[in-house]
């Protein structure tokens, strides 16, 4: 009897796990694309585009939205992009690492793919500022339909919600995060119910599923042309989050949530809004809220605000995760990463990113004042990132997966053509307010490329005149210095030369430790390195050891913890016997070849303000000695 009960409980637990994963995925992954109905049709019919609210116009736009969701999300992302996981991890930086590995041996192609990845990552940060601003603004604007004269409170209330959201980031969202899934499931059920309510009044709107209406729209509205895709793309914002959050849930829960709940709810709601517009063209000023019965307006505003806050939280968390990956892949200066949960390694907080995003979001809300005005700036960053993702996935499919070109190329051309059209449709937005995310993206791209190139030049300068390790060991055999007890660990980027910190220590203190470890930390193009492959140890005699630690771009680089795995009889990493020696380089801009003087100055500034090895590698504060070196670049 007991065994039967246990078996039943286990069966019940295994049966409920997919459901719980689906609910959790809905709460984290689909907030952005799930809140798009708040403003998409409003922008199309009453915004800058001014599509006529008539039978052909409404059905044409609905058809474009429907088939965009099918082609871009259901086919491209669900069937292809989500398969391009880097050991389970997704996102533009994980994909860049995968594409870089796929292009091994092709230097120019490898460089081009890295540039595409950095452009996509830079644009993602611009999108991370716009998403919270437009989402929360569009939700709170619903109050204007319920109360007269409250419109001037929309901006202050939005700022209160958004600033409050950024202020709580440092404390983590683990406790309230368990509510995100149920709230977003409720949100999508409400979206679907509102859609059914609207469609029931005008069922003919379902004819928009026929792609002929999309084609007819382009034929009739030739003046708008491709430009209207700049508004339709608002329905696709958040598609990149499906891929970015894959590491948390896996491909299957994300796909199930999309096809079973999210896609049906979105389609029903868009079509319900379309039915309302066909029945009452004046509803174009805010078709989402006017679709609801008057008694449900206030609760709907409350639920919408919660949904947009959750969508914003997902974007902010995504920016934190992207930054950590970029740091460990060497594209961004090291920053202090604070873990906000003892249970979930992925829940982190990066202060510099948080405050930068908050300033950007506040400026956007104050500058644009409404979701309609902000929609004119939305789309450039989103479509740019989507286009870069398609380029990187193309490289992975052809070079890493070795798909036959006769099968892969036609599909990839279709993806690139659609993404290219959406991006081209959004380029004019740059002069309509879309310059903000583009400028932010360009600035971040310059910072990332300058940091990467600067670090390469710094290593080259330090290598000039470096003393090979075998020669140094031979010299101390001839003239052995005084040896003191304990283990000295010198962090160095090179595995075959003597670190500057070791030479400085020997020059000034005239001593060497009994055990000297030259430690190099290497980051792989994979998210996680198993413990069995964590380290390499090589003994060089005279108490010298070469240790190489390998980490993935999502691993926690805890050096003292990793060194405990180095099981070698001659090595002792006891905390009270181990001293870590670090080198702090100060860069001096010069006329030497390498980078422009302004980039050298920028790199010097970033290097000076970067988080040091001490905190980044979790080294014990009272066991670290830091020695300075000046380097001309």
UniProtKB/Swiss-Prot annotation:
- Swiss-Prot/TrEMBL catalytic activity: K(+)(in) + H(+)(in) = K(+)(out) + H(+)(out)
The transmembrane residues are 21-41, 61-81, 112-132, 149-169, 176-196, 217-237, 258-278, 290-310, 348-368, 377-397, 398-418, 430-450
What's in the keyword line of the UniProt record? Answer: Cell inner membrane, Cell membrane, Ion transport, Membrane, Potassium, Potassium transport, Symport, Transmembrane, Transmembrane helix, Transport
UniProt main location, coarse = membrane
Mind telling me which InterPro entries this protein's record contains?
Answer: K+_transporter, K_trans_C, K_trans_N, Kup
- Give the UniProt entry's GO cellular component terms: plasma membrane
Membrane topology of this protein: Multi-pass membrane protein
GO MF annotation terms: potassium ion transmembrane transporter activity; symporter activity
Q: What name does UniProt use for this protein?
A: Probable potassium transport system protein Kup
Provide the gene name from the record: kup
